Amino acid sequence: MGSRCALALAVLSALLCQVWSSGVFELKLQEFVNKKGLLGNRNCCRGGAGPPPCACRTFFRVCLKHYQASVSPEPPCTYGSAVTPVLGVDSFSLPDGGGADSAFSNPIRFPFGFTWPGTFSLIIEALHTDSPDDLATENPERLISRLATQRHLTVGEEWSQDLHSSGRTDLKYSYRFVCDEHYYGEGCSVFCRPRDDAFGHFTCGERGEKVCNPGWKGPYCTEPICLPGCDEQHGFCDKPGECKCRVGWQGRYCDECIRYPGCLHGTCQQPWQCNCQEGWGGLFCNQDLNYCTHHKPCKNGATCTNTGQGSYTCSCRPGYTGATCELGIDECDPSPCKNGGSCTDLENSYSCTCPPGFYGKICELSAMTCADGPCFNGGRCSDSPDGGYSCRCPVGYSGFNCEKKIDYCSSSPCSNGAKCVDLGDAYLCRCQAGFSGRHCDDNVDDCASSPCANGGTCRDGVNDFSCTCPPGYTGRNCSAPVSRCEHAPCHNGATCHERGHRYVCECARGYGGPNCQFLLPELPPGPAVVDLTEKLEGQGGPFPWVAVCAGVILVLMLLLGCAAVVVCVRLRLQKHRPPADPCRGETETMNNLANCQREKDISVSIIGATQIKNTNKKADFHGDHSADKNGFKARYPAVDYNLVQDLKGDDTAVRDAHSKRDTKCQPQGSSGEEKGTPTTLRGGEASERKRPDSGCSTSKDTKYQSVYVISEEKDECVIATEV
């Protein structure tokens, strides 16, 4: 379980390291020369046009950005930018580290948080300032010189030197890109940090590869290397140098099986076997069968054969002889080596050590010299002081005599199916379509030419690309617009027509709008009516707002005319009505009272909203001084009070009620001539002149009450109506 967790963490660490790469671009300003002390516009740095001396207080603006075929000095500086303080006047040199001015560090460092692309564009501007505190770079009049270049740069510790000359100025500088600690590879994208713990036991190579510590192996160096010779199947180890045996095996290397218990003269190929040795038999191999097996008389690996009881023969191996093969044969006995060569006896063979000047199996050949021209294919021959010679082979050949041609393609250096061509002293990879580079290991960016049109997103493949189109476009390159009528934008049975990059709806009769979503009013036929459908079909232009507005205005005019006719008819009917009592003739009432009645000292009192509650229960309004308590008295004893608004001017009961009301509600002191004429009382007088016996009572809430209560004179029920 622990090893699995360690492996998972190591894999996660490797994935994260592939995403977060780290390195730094370093630019070292070494020397700047302004020969005449002039600005780029040939003016004196102090602003005048006169002759020198002109002292140019020089500072630099550095802009590092991505590779551009035509370098633009304008921002943004995608990789970083820096502005130095004033570093000198006219011509000066810059030491490493920036010198005494702590505000400037030389070299200038631009850290990278992503893989180094290998190319960059660099802009270095030398500018003049009158004050060390004014380091603005936007004024072109301050420019002394400008360097704008693009370069290819590989990762490494070595500095790339460069010199920029612009006629009057020279700038000497150097640059490099180095990886941060624990980062390796061509783009500083390989992360490797040495460790020696439960998660790995390794160091890092030059390219960031993991180099396992002694005794460890595996992708993350988490697997211990067991004791050399330890059987891989039958042994294991928890730490380097161990060899622990599995069940059924034994020995230092766990390569010996454990025999069946009780086996005496037997062996095993698998645990718990008992395979009898020659000359022995039985279940436990404890029964003697022959002499050869028991006594092993034959020596030096000879084969013993039982020829009878107690007898045997030995079959000797080459190089041995004797009854039991105990004697070795001396192959050097006939002295096979010639020309003074020394012989060495071997098993069933011999070898000759030749003196200087001779060679061959038995030293029978004399050595050649450079005079014999032994070197082939243009090799250069050199005589050895002890005799013989040596050949120095040209490029593309090897061997003692330069007789072998080197095949540079034998190691298969080309990747991705590329064909290797041997050029004699080098090789060339012919890449398949979609790949480039020396070894054809770079996938060509098919999206570099921006093949996707109309804002489509390009995804690179192998010799191919794909486009993710924005809404409204389709096709391999997003160049084909989606049919505008595809989603049926026209409503109410309209017909959709495509007109370039838009659509036009041919509306059915009676509908209008860009999508025929409006129902048009039916207008009388005439020359002023415009057929919107024909207009849309003929012109294919925008929505005919003029025609729609004209139709709406015409309908409004018709409605206004009808309203005017109704008003005139009502006015004419009112003129022909006979004169009537103002109160009887007024049909509009509020709180069940005519406007004129609300200002009289009326015989009906309105109870305020806070004094009465709408209910269908009977209430006693006839106690002692009930009229005074409740503040109201019946006005129309014999009239249906729900029909107050329907009373006519010629109703006799209404006239009697009015006369009775006038009699009862007249204030004291009024003359008989004023009988039947409504009298208006002020709010204060009404409250002061209230009489208990009068049966009339006024209320301050008379005019603006939402509930009007009418009581029968001899009935306990209360009728309430709400206006």
Curated annotation (Swiss-Prot):
Disordered: region residues: 653-702
Modified how: Ubiquitinated by MIB (MIB1 or MIB2), leading to its endocytosis and subsequent degradation. Ubiquitinated; promotes recycling back to the plasma membrane and confers a strong affinity for NOTCH1. Multi-ubiquitination of Lys-613 by MIB1 promotes both cis and trans-interaction with NOTCH1, as well as activation of Notch signaling. Ubiquitinated by NEURL1B. Phosphorylated in a membrane association-dependent manner. Phosphorylation at Ser-697 requires the presence of Ser-694, whereas phosphorylation at Ser-694 occurs independently of the other site. Phosphorylation is required for full ligand activity in vitro and affects surface presentation, ectodomain shedding, and endocytosis.
GO cellular component terms attached to this protein's record: adherens junction; apical plasma membrane; cytoplasmic vesicle; extracellular region; membrane raft; plasma membrane
Subcellular location: Apical cell membrane; Cell junction, Adherens junction; Membrane raft
Organism the protein comes from: Homo sapiens
Cystine pairs: C179-C188, C192-C204, C212-C221, C226-C237, C230-C243, C245-C254, C257-C268, C263-C274, C276-C285, C292-C304, C298-C314, C316-C325, C332-C343, C337-C352, C354-C363, C370-C381, C375-C391, C393-C402, C409-C420, C414-C429, C431-C440, C447-C458, C452-C467, C469-C478, C485-C496, C490-C505, C507-C516
Tissue expression pattern: Expressed in heart and pancreas, with lower expression in brain and muscle and almost no expression in placenta, lung, liver and kidney.
Residue intervals on the Extracellular side: 18-545
Keyword Lipoprotein: no
Self-association state and partner proteins as the record states: Homodimer. Interacts with TJP1. Interacts with MAGI1 (via PDZ domain); forms a complex with CTNNB1 and CDH2 and promotes recruitment to the adherens junction and stabilization on the cell surface. Interacts with PSEN1; undergoes a presenilin-dependent gamma-secretase cleavage that releases a Dll1-intracellular form. Interacts with MFAP5. Interacts with MIB1. Interacts with NEURL1B; leads to ubiquitination. Interacts with NEURL1. Interacts with SYNJ2BP; enhances DLL1 protein stability, and promotes Notch signaling in endothelial cells. Interacts with MAGI1, MAGI2, MAGI3 and MPDZ.
Membrane topology of this protein: Single-pass type I membrane protein
Domain EGF-like residue range list: 226-254, 257-285, 292-325, 332-363, 370-402, 409-440, 447-478, 485-516
Residues of the DSL domain: 177-221
Glycan-bearing residues: N477
Lineage: Eukaryota, Metazoa, Chordata, Craniata, Vertebrata
Protein known as: Delta-like protein 1
Crosslinked positions (Glycyl lysine isopeptide (Lys-Gly) (interchain with G-Cter in ubiquitin)): K613
Molecular functions per Gene Ontology: calcium ion binding; Notch binding; receptor ligand activity; scaffold protein binding; Tat protein binding
Positions of post-translational Phosphoserine modification: S694, S697
UniProt-listed GO biological process terms: astrocyte development; cell differentiation; cell fate determination; cerebellar molecular layer formation; cerebellar Purkinje cell layer structural organization; clathrin-dependent endocytosis; compartment pattern specification; determination of left/right symmetry
Keyword field: Autism spectrum disorder, Cell junction, Cell membrane, Developmental protein, Differentiation, Disulfide bond, EGF-like domain, Epilepsy, Glycoprotein, Intellectual disability, Isopeptide bond, Membrane, Notch signaling pathway, Phosphoprotein, Repeat, Signal, Transmembrane, Transmembrane helix, Ubl conjugation
Entry's transmembrane regions: 546-568
Annotated spans, Interaction with MAGI1: 720-723
